[in-house]
């Protein structure tokens, strides 16, 4: 079973759009253990350990459907899963190279603030799938 206390989102910058912040807060209420940090820069040294997985979001990344994403996250067993979201310019090639996985949410390009909301919804959906909750309808 996938649990939100093993998941964290690290994103560059603050959310300025109120409607996105409200959407994120709705999912945060459902997953209070989920860590969401707004940063100025990424420090991979703090995230890198034997028990951590780093997943960087980029439009060039690998795409999964919701069930496949759930399966992927479940395969990481007891590891802490850290998602990195860049700013308007994305993440650097250095961060992508040092990540365990580069993930794309879609072939479409989204503003970085909206990508956070979509990622949080997909995390909630993955948790729901792993718990056999009726939220996900395939």
Swiss-Prot record:
Transmembrane segments: none
Keywords: Cytoplasm, Methyltransferase, rRNA processing, S-adenosyl-L-methionine, Transferase
Reaction(s) the record says it catalyses: pseudouridine(1915) in 23S rRNA + S-adenosyl-L-methionine = N(3)-methylpseudouridine(1915) in 23S rRNA + S-adenosyl-L-homocysteine + H(+)
A Pfam family hit: SPOUT_MTase
Binding, S-adenosyl-L-methionine: 57, 86, 105-110
Localisation per UniProt entry: Cytoplasm
Source organism superkingdom: Bacteria
Predominant localisation class: cytoplasm
E.C. code: 2.1.1.177
GO molecular function: rRNA (pseudouridine-N3-)-methyltransferase activity
Gene3D superfamilies in the cross-refs: 3.40.1280.10
GO cellular component: cytoplasm
Function recorded in the entry: Specifically methylates the pseudouridine at position 1915 (m3Psi1915) in 23S rRNA.
Family: Belongs to the RNA methyltransferase RlmH family.
PANTHER family, A to Z: METHYLTRANSFERASE, RIBOSOMAL RNA LARGE SUBUNIT METHYLTRANSFERASE H
Subunit record text: Homodimer.
Protein name: Ribosomal RNA large subunit methyltransferase H
Naturally occurring in which organism (per UniProt): Prochlorococcus marinus (strain MIT 9301)
The gene coding this protein: rlmH
């Amino acid at each position: 079973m996938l649990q939100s206390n093993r998941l964290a989102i690290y994103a560059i910058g603050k959310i300025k759009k109120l409607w996105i912040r409200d959407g994120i807060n709705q999912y945060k209420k459902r997953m209070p253990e989920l860590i969401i940090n707004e940063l100025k820069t990424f420090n991979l040294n703090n995230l890198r350990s034997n028990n951590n997985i780093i997943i960087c979001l980029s439009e060039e990344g690998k795409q999964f459907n919701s069930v496949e994403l759930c399966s992927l996250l479940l395969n990481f067993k007891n590891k802490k899963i850290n998602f990195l979201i860049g700013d308007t310019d994305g993440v650097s090639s250095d961060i992508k190279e040092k990540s365990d996985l580069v993930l794309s949410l879609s072939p479409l390009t989204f503003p970085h603030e909206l990508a956070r909301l979509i990622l949080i919804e997909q995390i909630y959906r993955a948790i729901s799938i792993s718990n056999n909750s009726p939220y996900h309808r395939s």
